[in-house]
Design a protein with these regions (language model features):
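Alpha-helical transmembrane-bundle signature of multi-pass membrane transport and export proteins
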Residues: 1-438
Length: 438
């Protein structure tokens, strides 16, 4: 445990009046950040669909090439997340957001130019996709670290809830918008539309009036110094009980969920015999769930307390997935049951994410916000490929229904570190900040 404060000390507070918390929407700088991040999130979702379609439709790429392109775009989350955290903690975060937006806009605008001049090849997409992915990692980490500088402590949950709603809307609407753009304007032009959206984000964030203090000089400019800074972030996360519990919970969840997802997508057509249209309905139920969860996430801690909200939302989201293995056969009832499971998983899962993120930001000193966010991002994205392998091998070894059940049990086990930690006992007030060890 770190010296001084364990960030989740339990206090017996009375339920606060939620009306006493000023609306986050009255904060003009937050509104600009929300607008910019929303534009950036939509750009990322449009690009995530359009880049592979450029490979398929414009370059007639093979299935292996498309798979490699997808992996290359995601690879920076594993390779550069920890180092991105160091940079975010040593540079003004608003500047990073603007620079990564402009950088991704420039990178993506190269795609249609190369296509129109008959110079575009799959190798170009690999290179451009990788650097665009690096920009996304930096933007994500900087965005999480920047929010606590713009809003009051009591507004963090509402702010994260609003940003979570944008993430949900982009997840639902971004691919659909990207599909329409590809259909009407071709895939390379759809990529250009993503670049324009990044420009909108950069301009909006540039108008934020909040002035950040000059970052503290650091030894991180040298390779050895950078590694020491990375280690300091890892030590802070795993050396403090509440942050360690969050990270362990996230790693168990992501490992199990990725394995479950691999099995579930095979379970529906092969075991239940669902048609592509029925599978689409089941997966579409996630969208409304995301929006409902994000809409209510900001209010739940004021009504039920932070610890109870975290434990309850995580319990419902994870335990409901045990119901998948009980579904037999196709037909309306099976589809409706799976839609309900996905809806509940999405709504309670988003509410849990918002609450956990708000507490993590509150516990973390400003000088470590980037590295703590990056460590969590590294764990979440880094363990997913292992989960996919486990899901595939289990499905082949013990069958899809058994795999769905086993991985859902694994998902439920993510509740254990949360339930045993001091996080579950946090009442209505956000916990005090953990003091950084010298």
């Amino acid at each position: 445990m770190s010296e001084a404060t364990s960030g989740a000390q339990v206090q017996e507070e009375q339920e606060p009046d939620s009306a006493a918390v000023p609306s986050v929407w009255k904060n003009r700088d937050f509104t600009k950040l929300w607008t910019g991040q929303t534009a950036s999130l939509f750009a990322a979702q449009i690009t995530e669909l359009a880049l592979p379609l450029v490979a398929v439709l414009a370059l007639t790429a093979t299935s292996q090439q498309v798979g490699l392109l997808t992996s290359v775009v995601k690879l920076p989350y594993l390779l550069v997340s920890l180092f991105a955290g160091v940079l975010v903690d040593r540079v003004r975060r608003r500047n990073i957001l603007i620079a990564t937006d402009l950088g991704r806009a420039l990178i993506l605008s190269v795609v249609p130019v190369l296509y129109w001049t008959d110079q575009l090849g799959i190798s170009w997409l690999y290179v451009l996709g990788f650097f665009a992915g690096c920009g996304s990692v930096l933007f994500d980490v900087a965005g999480q670290a920047y929010l606590p500088r713009l809003v009051e402590r009591d507004q963090l949950t509402r702010g994260n809830s609003a940003l979570g709603a944008s993430q949900s809307a982009a997840t639902i609407g971004g691919p659909a918008l990207g599909g329409v753009l590809v259909q009407w304007l071709t895939a390379p032009v759809a990529v250009l539309a993503g670049a324009v959206s990044y420009l909108v984000s950069a301009v909006t964030i540039w108008t934020i009036g909040h002035k950040e203090d000059r970052p503290t000089p650091s030894e991180a400019a040298s390779p050895a110094g950078t590694l020491r800074e990375v280690w300091a972030g890892l030590r802070f996360v795993f050396g403090n009980e509440p942050l360690r519990a969050m990270t362990i919970m996230a790693s168990i969840f992501n490992l199990s969920f990725t394995a479950l997802e691999v099995a579930f997508l095979q379970f529906m057509p092969r075991t239940l015999g669902l048609s592509p249209g029925e599978i689409g309905l089941v997966m579409a139920a996630l969208g409304p769930g995301f929006l409902v969860g994000a809409a209510f996430a900001g209010r739940l801690p004021q009504r039920f307390g932070y610890g109870r909200t975290m434990l309850t939302t995580a319990s419902v989201a994870n335990l409901v997935m045990l119901g998948i293995s009980t579904v037999h056969g196709g037909g309306f009832l099976s589809v409706a049951t799976l839609m309900l499971i996905n809806f509940l998983f999405a709504s309670f899962g988003v509410a849990n994410n918002v609450t956990v993120l708000s507490i993590r930001q509150t516990l973390t000193p400003d000088s470590l916000q980037g590295r703590v966010a990056a460590t969590n991002r590294f764990v979440a994205m880094g363990i997913a490929p292992l989960g996919a392998l486990i899901g595939g091998f289990l499905g082949a070894g013990v069958g899809l229904r058994s795999t769905v059940l086993i991985t859902a049990i694994g998902l439920s086990s993510a509740l254990v570190p949360l339930a045993l930690s001091s996080l579950a006992r946090i009442k209505y007030e956000l916990p005090p900040q953990i003091q950084e060890r010298p």
